[in-house]
Amino acid sequence: MIQLYNSLTNKKEPFVPIVPGKVSMYVCGPTVYNYIHVGNARPAIAFDTVRRYLTYRGYEVKYVLNFTDVDDKIIRTANELGEDTETLTNRYIEAYLADTGALNVQPADVHPRVTDTMEEIIEFIRQLETEGFAYESEGDVYFRTKKFETYGKLSQQSIEDLRAGSRVDVGEKKEDPLDFVLWKAAKPDEPSWDSPWGKGRPGWHIECSAMAKKHLGTTIDIHAGGHDLKFPHHENEIAQSEACNHAKFANYWLHNGFINIENEKMSKSLGNFLLVHEALKEVDPMVLRFFMLSVHYRHPINYSRELIEQAANGWSRIKEAYQNIEYRLSVTAGLGEASESMERKLESIKASFIESMDDDINTANAVTVLFDLAREANIYAKADHVAKATLEQVLSLFDELTGVLGLTLAEEKELLDAEIDQLIQERNDARAARNFARADEIRDLLKEQNIQLEDTAQGVRWKRL
């Protein structure tokens, strides 16, 4: 059975969805005012992998990841660039989908935007006001935190301790330092919407509560996001949602660890970030994904050139093993007798993979299992007697397990040296038979694979570009 580490209880728990066989999952997406950096890609990859594994285990997953497309940073950036917020956010939403798509992150089933959810947000706040959990103050609306008695349960903090660390400045409009804004009164030259409290726009926390409810209902199976969102964002989501809906908001809370540079969190505010599209100019997308999966999603990762090179070498080992099996399959004639011992090893490897992923989506252990598969594949590829059926089983298991992790092998295939030599011999034979069309076809095929041919007096020489 799948066990997930629930941040709400701080322990691993058996995963039991609300509706048998179905999973509702909400992930806090980006505020779209800039390109995403490598740290932003961590939750995208981590929770895409959770979704993939749940699907692999037979669940029907409805996956929602939002775009925050109205925010102080968005407004400020749009003003600096002299463009409207819609143009800005559309550009960065497209960029987000392109960058995460390059990392083989599947699009969500629903990508809601705040600006498309305004009616539901306003109704949500109105309901909180009716219940006595919200109050209006000079056009702003705040959540009355002291009325929600279990506030702090996600971050394991008491209201008293939180209040002791807060203060209300003179002239501030809140009743309590812990109260947070649900609706902001309109300011000149900012996007605004009509509401019962006058023109304005929503606060950040209420947006996710409303979008989750609209697309997944009052109680969802899994809510996920970065560790930095646990407090106050997720804490406030719980307070709003449970106060409004009189129901538990989410049964499982998953939080991914940070990506650090020089042991400090990668972030735009610190200026120590690396944009994904810049990183991918130097790092293969599958290597970057493999790098992140090599560490458990809850643990921090230190990003460095040395560790990226280690990930590249590890991914290369797995690819080469896959290609060795492909080549042996291509030159193996006849059916042959299937290897029972190899098939037993494959069954054991698959069982170990599932055991690792059942344990709170432990991709670090799952990657170790891939190395076990690569080792056994290399041994079998060199065996004197092999069977096509067994070779095909090895390839199938590679595709199955890497597919669960969102890693692609077949699409990245490079020609092996032996395959290149074989094609060159075929080209030589075609030229000798004056079949120049076929010879040119082979030359073009090799060129597409970045293989350059040079005809010399001693024969054809080739090199990789």
Curated annotation (Swiss-Prot):
Binding site for ATP: K268
Cofactor info, note text: Binds 1 zinc ion per subunit.
Record-linked Gene3D superfamilies: Cysteine-tRNA ligase, C-terminal anti-codon recognition domain, HUPs
Gene name in the database record: cysS
Enzyme class: ligase
InterPro entries, per the entry: Cys-tRNA-ligase, Cys-tRNA-synt_Ia_DALR, Cys-tRNA/MSH_ligase, Rossmann-like_a/b/a_fold, tRNA-synt_1_cat_dom, tRNAsynth_Ia_anticodon-bd
Cofactor(s) the record lists: Zn(2+)
Organism: Exiguobacterium sp. (strain ATCC BAA-1283 / AT1b)
Any GO molecular function: cysteine-tRNA ligase activity
Annotated GO CC locations: cytosol
UniProt record similarity statement: Belongs to the class-I aminoacyl-tRNA synthetase family.
Record's catalysed reaction(s): tRNA(Cys) + L-cysteine + ATP = L-cysteinyl-tRNA(Cys) + AMP + diphosphate
Protein's name according to its UniProt entry: Cysteine--tRNA ligase
Motif ('HIGH' region): 30-40
Gene Ontology BP annotations: cysteinyl-tRNA aminoacylation
EC number assigned by the record: 6.1.1.16
Chain span(s) of sequence motif 'KMSKS' region: 265-269
UniProt KW keywords: Aminoacyl-tRNA synthetase, ATP-binding, Cytoplasm, Ligase, Metal-binding, Nucleotide-binding, Protein biosynthesis, Zinc
Binding site for Zn(2+): C28, C208, H233, E237
Oligomeric form and interacting partners: Monomer.
